[in-house]
């Protein structure tokens, strides 16, 4: 199994405030699953972090595998934007994360399912 972790989950894990998510994170970490993140999530978390949180974020990302955003992912994200931007308000960041999940055949772990109306996306529960 491959799981791509969305920014909202990474925020919860890094701050440790949601016991349910942290417990699920620990179970996932102890499993054989490949756990991925997108560079989009790095940008989102870094932009909202305080300097005192930088080391913890670096350590969090070191424990995971970064999935690249290549040309194919860019085209897929563009297709998602064309299809869902007006009808569902999908933004560039979410389109890129969705394209990365689809391209890696990864389940997406997010609490913001409404941001991902794409039929190709399967969710991690």
Where do the model's predicted regions map?
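Acidic, PIN/NYN-like endoribonuclease modules and their adjacent C-terminal/linker elements
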Residues: 1-2, 98-125
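Active-site neighborhoods of divalent-metal-dependent phosphate/nucleic-acid chemistry enzymes
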Residues: 20, 65-111
């Amino acid at each position: 199994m491959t799981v791509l972790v969305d920014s909202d989950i990474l925020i919860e894990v890094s701050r440790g405030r949601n016991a349910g998510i942290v417990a699920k994170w620990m179970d996932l970490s102890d499993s054989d699953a490949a756990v991925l993140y997108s560079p989009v999530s790095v940008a989102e978390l870094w932009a909202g972090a305080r300097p005192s949180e930088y080391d913890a974020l670096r350590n969090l990302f070191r424990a995971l595998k970064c999935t690249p955003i290549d040309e194919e992912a860019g085209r897929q994200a563009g297709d998602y934007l064309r299809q869902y931007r007006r009808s569902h308000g999908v933004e560039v960041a979410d389109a890129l994360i969705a394209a990365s999940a689809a391209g890696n055949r990864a389940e997406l772990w997010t609490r913001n399912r409404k941001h991902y109306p794409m039929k190709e996306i399967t969710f991690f529960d």
